[in-house]
Amino acid sequence: RGDSYQLSKMAAENSECRWIVFCGVHFMAETADILANRPEKVAQRDGRRVEVILPDMAAGCSMADMAAIEQVEAAWEDLAEVVDTDEITPITYINSAASLKAFCGRHGGVVCTSSNAAGVLQWAFERRRRVLFFPDQHLGRNTALTMDITNDQMPVWDPYAHELGGNDSQAIQQGRVILWKGHCSVHQMFQPGHVHQLREQYPDIQILVHPECPQEANDLA
């Protein structure tokens, strides 16, 4: 029992495990495969890999699908035209394809979860000036706002825009966190009106909001 990362860790740490049946979406099964079959784990099993089975191959995550590796690689090349990409740390939310995690690894980046996003951003800024955060703009924005980074320092990169993700070069050069235009289709639905409605019905209620929700709902909660 746990979130997808915790479940993957539990399966990977089980030395007797031979198969993992992950009743979830693609990125969850990929994460389990990465953790269970990293080189040191395979060596401990004398070269045997753990097979990961996804019962429904059509099970996907709309947010993970909003950032394709080809789009991210193209964005990186475009960014290189206006800033030094050696000053950018790519960060991908764990809710993303394995190809994006590999991209981060190739470029000195990292994978984060919703619970450690603040620590990961802090780690990144201790090393480089900027961050490219994908695929969830809300998690990136809500986390960065707690670190005194303002919205005007967080340009949103639209992979379908014609040039620089819909930004001018000045916005990119002044940016600290470049946010990918992606979101969770479910968390996106929670709006300030829901918070107001609950507070009217239950004046003393404590409202917990996930950082994948829009900033406006997070701020009110």
Spans of model-derived segments:
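The feature marks the mature, well-folded catalytic cores of soluble enzymes
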Residues: 1-221
